[in-house]
Amino acid sequence: SERRTARVPFNQARPVSAETMTALDEVLRPGDGEFEWVHDATNLAALKEICRNAWAVEMETPAAMHESSMLTRIGEDEINAAPDGISLSGPAMEAMSAAGVLTQAKMNDPSSFAYAETRKFYNRNIDSAMAFGWLATSGNSRTDQLRAGAGWVRLQLAATRMGLAMQPFSQALQEYPEMAEIFEEIHDFTGVRAPRSALDGRLQGLFRFGYARPSAPAPRWPLQTRLIVADE
């Protein structure tokens, strides 16, 4: 299966069933972490609020927002020159970029159209979630993190096979000072004690689920550009 990250609003007419979420859990292997999920209205509303607040903190924290905007590639020329980060393509993006309306600098300017639209874009995605799931580990060592990463891939491959769209939301799991209160809140909500050391449990991933049209593959560097040839 080809895994894709869905960065679009999900279909509001198609709920995600408990059977589907349970089937996702069954693909995990020992050591991948514990996967839990919610799809009821009350818990969905609570998690949407946490995610919206986390996104607001990121946008209102200059260093964090600057990092995101500088990793955004706008239009085919930028994407082809550096096929990584966050890609924005299509006729509308090209036109706004050419007109100077959508640029990395504008995305950093709270008074700009680009900043306002970026905020609305992510909030629409958050509000369209039909289920949320999270992956937690009992410790937070590098091994725990790597195993959880493998679990994440297994979850996404399984979701793809089921026709289910999945998108990670990492903002609430960031560890910079401005996010500290929300970091504690999301751990409290999920019943995982926020980590104080590598011995403590931690949320390793938070994801929204739903149904959407198939996503195109994200741009990637050719494999040969990432390989290092060892000296003979």
What are these regions (language model features)?
Residues S1-E232:
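Acidic, surface-exposed loops and disordered segments
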